[in-house]
């Protein structure tokens, strides 16, 4: 089956065209700056790249551009739309409606629309991507794969907030969790690597990127995760605060005369390691600055790793033991300094970390960074959310 996988952002559209038999991306690319000046498409196939600048006023135009590239005489991969079997969409928030991927119909679109208030930056764009495909590739099934779905197995005592119960009943305010597609994918990959059934394993997965979250996975099911009602909770991130005392927000709003929008901006865009360091949200810049003696940059790195480590301890308690700790995503896969800070001094848990292996880890494959006698495995597992979306699409359509 050949699946077009789409990840629609508010001003970008990432795509991959995946053959599910070989699990290879035949081509991929991104349409960037949708609705903004300087829009372009970057398309890659077999290591070759083509960049085309043109006005892209909305997601419909973006989808048209993608289809043009897929059927391009030199850089394309198909002769006609008939060769696209299905389209798999990343949808950020599925609320309590969806605990699995789903074939899109009017009812599904209505539910995605109802979750817009939970993910105002992402869900409208995800929906635009779906509707653009219905218009431009009619008659082909669209499948929605939700970031929140994997975490719908969390027990109620884990996902509820200790607010008046009526608040949950009225507004569905609870922990939802995100990055579910990534957490699920790396858990499956880790089980394959360990040659053990996923349903026998206790795993802690650390998806560390510009947005970061940790997940406790017991026997293949998510039982807790660090993000919450929104992707703002949990770890300190690139520009997001992570969990803070809610009274701080009230105090600051009063002292600084801030409205809700300004506070939202502060928490989502000006906080995290950027806010602490005053340097950057990028860990490469932070490490460079820290090495040059910038104390705030060092503090930002230390705070980030300290929180990850706290979640590892917390989730080890929740799971009643751990078989493997997994690092994935941009920072998790590529930053040995962060990994080291997160897993040193965990000998009491049975984690025997190997510095040599960590700093010489091979990129692009599952790699073990623990000593042979370590009771707990520490693994780097490259994530592949697009492939997971293609797999879910295939699984649903072959049911």
UniProtKB/Swiss-Prot annotation:
This is Acetate kinase. Homodimer. InterPro entries: Ac/propionate_kinase (IPR004372), Aliphatic_acid_kin_short-chain (IPR000890), Aliphatic_acid_kinase_CS (IPR023865), ATPase_NBD (IPR043129). GO terms for molecular function: acetate kinase activity; ATP binding; magnesium ion binding. GO terms for cellular component: cytoplasm. PANTHER family: ACETATE KINASE, ACETATE KINASE-RELATED. It catalyses: acetate + ATP = acetyl phosphate + ADP. Catalyzes the formation of acetyl phosphate from acetate and ATP. Can also catalyze the reverse reaction. Its EC number is 2.7.2.1. GO terms for biological process: acetate metabolic process; acetyl-CoA biosynthetic process. The record marks 179, 240 as: Transition state stabilizer. ATP binds at residues 14, 207-211, 282-284, 330-334. Its cofactor is Mg(2+); Mn(2+). Mg(2+). Can also accept Mn(2+). The gene is ackA. It comes from the Bacteria.
